Structure formats: C-alpha cells, structure tokens
Amino acid sequence: MKKLWLLLSVATFTGFIAPGPAVKTVKEDKTLLLTQLQQTRDNLLKDVQGLTDAQLEYKTAPDRWSVIECVEHVTLIEKAIMEGEQHLVQQPANPERRKDIKATDEQIIKGVEDRSHKVKAPEFGVPKHNYSSNAEAIKNFTESRNKLIEYVTNTNDDLRNHVMDHPVLGPIDAYQLLLLDAAHTNRHTQQLEEVKADPGFPK
C-alpha cells in the first residue's frame, strides 16, 4: 500500500480544492465508473492512433514527456491503483465510515483532471522505456484498462462500503479510487494533446 499512498498524496491531488459537504446519495450502479473508464480509454487510444514512432517519441523539451511516455505513465499508475484497490476490497467492509466521506465523485474527477496544478510523478510512475516497441506500450495500456473494465463489470465486491483514508481528501471509497484512475488518464490525455499541438510536432 505504500506505493498507493505515495501516488495519492503526491501524484494526483496536490492543489486539490477542499471538498464540500458529503453527498448522501450513493450510486450503487456502475454506470458512471464504467463510462469514465471506457471514455478515457477510447479518447487516449484515438489520440495515439496512426501516429508514427517519430510523433510518439517527440518531446517539446528534453525534460518533458513524449506522447508514448504519457501512455506508459498512465499504465504504471493504473497498475499501482489496482494493487491498492484489491488490497482495499479484501479488507472487511466498513460501511459505518461512509458518513465520513466528504469528497463527491464529481469533485474527485474534476480535481484530478485539472492540469493547472502541475505535480511531479512518483519515481515508480516515471516511464522506464521497458517496452520493445511503442505498439507494445499502447497494447499494454489497452490490456490493463480492459482488464479493469472487466473487473468493474463483473465484480460483486461492495465498492461503496470499503472506505480508506486519503491523505488530502480524507475518507474515500473503493469506487472513488477507480474514478481517480479514470480521471488520471484524462489528465495525461490532455498532456499528450498539448504535445501534439506543439509547433515542432512532426508532420
């Protein structure tokens, strides 16, 4: 869980606006979560479709990430979040803590997607270029996300009644943890779109 805590406290919510009062309505269906996971997957894949290796590897500056590095980072963070998710749902359910949750689903999504707050990725989330090809990196993301979507679709885990303490937001549930993952994907899809919009991006 140490990796997950570092991720949550450093990589995603630095600068997050203090949440408002808790929303009492609990969405037990999976519609929002599945929509977020599917849409952010599809948007990322659409943005990288048809790009050449030169385009995928282009950097706006030596210390900035390329498109393919954004993809690898998203995959690394998703795997860390899934490790934390599985650990969380294997613990005894604690529905009595639902009353302590302050952050709404919408606040989590908007807070992570906001790129006006620049943050440094944890070391385990920094791209390592461990793939034999750019196509393999994209395939790895696709397989990881499809596996996560399959889990959400088929699981009987009570995601809303497994609550963990977030170092910034306070208590959040296992459902919200996966919303965080989808929003993180969108955050870096925005980043790779900025790379593609750079005047020096290969044609």
Report each predicted region and the residues it spans:
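Start-of-domain marker
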Residues: V23-R64
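Short, contiguous alpha-helical
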Residues: Y58-Q107, N154, D158-K203
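Stable alpha-helical elements in mature extracytoplasmic
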Residues: D29, L33, T40, L44, ...
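Positively charged n-region of N-terminal signal peptides that target proteins for export
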Residues: M1-L4
